[in-house]
Regions:
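Active-site anion/phosphate-binding pocket segments in diverse small-molecule metabolic enzymes
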Residues: 1-177
């Protein structure tokens, strides 16, 4: 079947785990290289640990009164006096618009809701219930501890691959040892 082919592969991450006889002499370990599951049970089987986080910073904080609309199309209206954080990540960076008014991010170790529509270049979060919050604080879209890629994928009705692969070129990659 293989003839004179020197290198043959037909196994990606899932095949490597579940069909080792199909590996031939090369494999394409995709998502498992980053520590994410390609199929149910992969994390335990290989002791996978996710290696990437998606992080930004608060660029602006503002307290608004009750009944204030947030974002385009007035899709969110505050029910109480609310402290709103603006974060410079939007759908052009890979944050799904479907997370508008239903997603969460992590600030100072706590989950806070995304409010209003996710915009092209930014989104807003309700930080009213955080004891301390300042402009410049880290914001995790995912950190693999408090919020995972899998949680985000589920909220978006998709798979972890799509969440990771749609982080755009605009987002700087920082490699650490």
């Amino acid at each position: 079947i293989l003839g004179d082919l020197r290198y043959v592969h037909c196994s990606a991450s899932n095949g490597i785990l579940n069909f080792p006889n199909s590996n031939y002499n090369l494999v394409r370990p995709g998502i498992i290289l980053y520590g994410y599951e390609s199929c149910e049970g992969a994390a335990e089987k290989l002791n996978l640990k996710p290696v990437c986080k998606f992080k930004s910073k608060i660029t602006f904080l503002k307290e608004v009164e009750a009944n204030t609309s947030i974002g385009y199309s007035r899709s969110f209206v505050t029910k109480r006096k609310t402290k709103v954080a603006t974060i410079p990540v939007g759908y052009a960076d890979g944050l799904k618009r479907v997370l508008s008014n239903k997603g969460e991010v992590v600030i100072n170790g706590k989950k806070v809701p995304i409010i209003g529509s996710v915009c092209m270049d930014s989104f807003m979060a309700d930080v009213t219930d955080l004891e301390e919050v300042s402009s410049g604080d880290d914001v995790y879209i995912w950190d693999n501890e408090n919020i995972t890629v899998e949680e985000i994928a589920k909220a978006c009705g998709t798979i972890n691959y799509e969440i990771i692969c749609t982080v755009s070129y605009r987002v700087p990659r920082v490699f650490v040892k």
